[in-house]
Amino acid sequence: MMSVSLAWPAPAKLNLFLHINGRLPNGYHELQTLFQFIDYGDWLDFKITATPELKLHSNLSQVVPDSDNLILKAAKSLQSVTGCIQGAEIWLDKRLPMGGGLGGGSSDAATTLVALNALWQLGLDKKALMDIGLTLGADVPVFINGIAAFAEGVGEKLQPVDVAEPWYLVLIPDAHVSTADVFQHPDLPRNTPKLDMSSLSPERWSNDCQALVSAKYPQVANALSWLVEYAPSRMTGTGACVFGEFGSQQAALEALAKKPAEMQGFVAKGLNRSPLELRLAQL
């Protein structure tokens, strides 16, 4: 019987700020952001097989085609780089919204790389996994690294940070925001002055995509206008999700209980060390 390994977390991230500093000659945007994890996300289970086939099961009603699925792409990339002839059957319990700015797809890919590297006993170090992850998406290395980070460049230059770990109320507006559309929009601010590590004070944190997305998606604007009545609030990534910062779990839960019925949301704890790091330490 092949080995089964259960309950690998693929946590969400929040961009505590997102500043766009300019546009590079290759068309990519130069940015600065601060990534922090939260104790809420997707879950993956793995059954290791002796043959190289890969199968993915999911609780989603709409399954992403295999050719576009980041979980399968991650597993295949790992096989390709290492020559591994083992395979896996993978179960995804999807809890994070797609197009929400919480990094769900990138986190799923990162957890797949980290878990299969361990379960296939490949022995790649974190840097090698991050290099593979970067070929799958700009945010994947953040989740592999597993530590809250100040990111620069196109998001690939990471410096560990130790910031407060508050409770968050995250709202999920009924909107799917295209990251590509946001970054291509002519009205997106692209000239925010750069911060350095010594000036990462929260009063300077903002999201340069927020005004544009709020104008285009009234669901996002409505969520922000409601949430800001209870706590300092802003959008994560290019949206659509927004978050408010609370001093206690109780305060966040009390606000959640008052949210309008048409809004979805959850309460989660900010974490400077990813739950994936903690899961790996249990092996």
From Swiss-Prot:
Keywords, ordered alphabetically: ATP-binding, Isoprene biosynthesis, Kinase, Nucleotide-binding, Transferase
Region forming the signal peptide: none
Residues reported to bind ATP: 97-107
Active-site residues from the entry: 13, 139
Coiled coil (UniProt feature): none
EC class (word): transferase
NCBIfam families: ispE
Source species, domain of life: Bacteria
Organism of provenance: Shewanella amazonensis (strain ATCC BAA-1098 / SB2B)
Function of the molecule: Catalyzes the phosphorylation of the position 2 hydroxy group of 4-diphosphocytidyl-2C-methyl-D-erythritol.
Record Pfam families: GHMP_kinases_C, GHMP_kinases_N
EC nos: 2.7.1.148
Catalysed reaction equations from the record: 4-CDP-2-C-methyl-D-erythritol + ATP = 4-CDP-2-C-methyl-D-erythritol 2-phosphate + ADP + H(+)
Pathway membership: Isoprenoid biosynthesis; isopentenyl diphosphate biosynthesis via DXP pathway; isopentenyl diphosphate from 1-deoxy-D-xylulose 5-phosphate: step 3/6
Disulfide links within the chain: none
UniProt similarity note: Belongs to the GHMP kinase family. IspE subfamily.
One function term, GO molecular function aspect: ATP binding
Protein name: 4-diphosphocytidyl-2-C-methyl-D-erythritol kinase
GO BP terms in the entry: isopentenyl diphosphate biosynthetic process, methylerythritol 4-phosphate pathway; terpenoid biosynthetic process
